[in-house]
């Protein structure tokens, strides 16, 4: 009677942690300087005015304002921050 008694454990069962990539602030949302707008691998979205590009391609706000997404003729999507108009005092 040949029976297998001690089978090895499966070779699967591993996975990497999710990186939580994607858009964090959508068009029209208010941001302050330093807010992360998009986390990405590579430049799926490109930096426009009043935003910075981190070394990991994170796009973040440089000034307070509202987020704006714009597709240019070259097909690239540019992320900008439109500063809020200061209230006249």
Swiss-Prot record:
- Spell out the Gene3D superfamilies in the cross-references: 2.40.50.100
Q: Any keyword Nucleus? A: no
Which InterPro entries is this protein grouped with? Ribosomal_bL27, Ribosomal_bL27_CS
Per the record, the domain of life is Bacteria
One of the entry's Gene Ontology molecular-function terms is:
structural constituent of ribosome
PROSITE patterns in the cross-refs: RIBOSOMAL_L27
Q: Mind listing the UniProt keywords for this protein, alphabetically?
A: Ribonucleoprotein, Ribosomal protein
The UniProt entry's GO biological process terms, in alphabetical order, are: translation
> Where does it sit, as one GO cellular component term?
cytosolic large ribosomal subunit
* Keyword Ribosomal protein carried by entry: yes
Q: Where is this region: Disordered?
A: 1-21
Instruction: Say which family it is in.
Output: Belongs to the bacterial ribosomal protein bL27 family.
Name of the protein in its database record: Large ribosomal subunit protein bL27
Native source species: Rhizobium rhizogenes (strain K84 / ATCC BAA-868)
The gene name on file is: rpmA
